[in-house]
């Protein structure tokens, strides 16, 4: 399966929407988009994974690397998991939890909520 990555802006946040499978083959595409956003000075990023059906360790690696890069620029990274993912356990959420890295990320239910300054993330 291919990966589709779209970029937008909302409320001062760069929004990267990812759809498809985030794996060894497709993770470099996401890494490149995140690096390009940071290089362009966009240090507050919402990574919308609501359309991701599968994520392997390469996908998790790119999420962790993105977090590290953005934090090094004093930016913020917010994730959107598939519908009800943080509550009921989407594939992406289960992988992040199984690897013990879910707690590293601020997860929100949707892009609109993530792009608001006064919103709190969903619990880990």
Where on the chain are the PLM-derived regions?
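STAS-like cytosolic regulatory interaction modules
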Residues: 1-53, 65-124
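Helical "lid/switch" subdomain of P-loop NTPase nucleotide-binding domains
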Residues: 58-59
């Amino acid at each position: 399966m291919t990966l589709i990555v779209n970029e937008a802006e909302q409320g001062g946040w760069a929004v990267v929407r990812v759809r498809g499978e985030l794996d060894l083959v497709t993770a470099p595409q996401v890494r490149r988009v995140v690096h390009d956003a940071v290089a362009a000075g966009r240090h507050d990023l919402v990574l919308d994974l609501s359309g991701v059906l599968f994520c392997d360790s390469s996908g998790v690696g790119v999420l962790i690397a993105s977090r590290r890069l953005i934090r090094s620029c004093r930016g913020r990274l917010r994730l959107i998991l598939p519908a009800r993912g943080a509550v009921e356990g989407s594939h992406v959420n289960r992988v992040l939890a199984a690897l013990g890295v879910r707690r590293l990320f601020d997860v929100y239910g949707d892009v609109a909520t993530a792009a608001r300054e006064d919103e709190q993330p969903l619990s880990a």
